[in-house]
Amino acid sequence: MRHLIFLLSIALFIPFQAHAQPQQVKTGVYLMNLYDLNMDEHSFYADFYIWFKWKGRIDPTSIEFVNAIEKWSMDKATFDGDSTPVSLKTGEKYKIFRIEGRFFHSFSLNRFPLDQHQLDIQIENPEFPADSLQYVADTMGAQIRNTLNMVGWDMKGSEIVTKVHDYGSNFGNPEENAQRYSNLSYQINLARPLSYFLLKMLLPLFIVMLVSIGGLLLHPTHIDSRSS
């Protein structure tokens, strides 16, 4: 009898555990263009591809860009007009989109002119909380177009960071607990090159100092010139 109860307990426990596991979604980003860093308005523009690979019943592509200011477009990056996911040999479903938009970033200039910045693009799925859906980084999921150059900046690479975003609020719905969502952040590392500091800051200062010293060394017969 005890063995029967034990087996029944196991049978009930296993489905519960399987149901408790959130559906994982492998996510990757390929940055095409980055431009118009506006430190006064704390914003930047980005153009990139984002893809999703998953197994399960939930379609994870109904995403929200948490720090988006303007989203110009979100187009499925296929040419056959079919909006259904692609079935991979691994048994996973696959979708890829191309995104263009303007995003918020709070620029810190404490280390100007040798400042460094970590721009980020954050996504969440507002339809499914973290206990149902979880975004994870795909293998080699953070990439930058190898011909992408930004004048006045050095590209220091990119990475994907995931976490659970706990809002600490049920947003006015008394029947819901505090909302927690899987948050995926694509981070782009930028730094001003040393040449910017030398050419834009030190060189003009050095020229002014040379002119000032040269004026002091003028012969007294050129006093009028020195005074000027």
Predicted regions and their residues:
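Bacterial N-terminal signal peptides
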Residues: 5-15
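Bacterial Sec-dependent signal peptides at the C-terminal "C-region" and cleavage site
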Residues: 13-23
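Soluble non-transmembrane domains of integral membrane proteins
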Residues: 21-185, 189
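Channel- or pocket-lining gating/hinge segments that regulate access to a cavity or pore
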Residues: 185-228
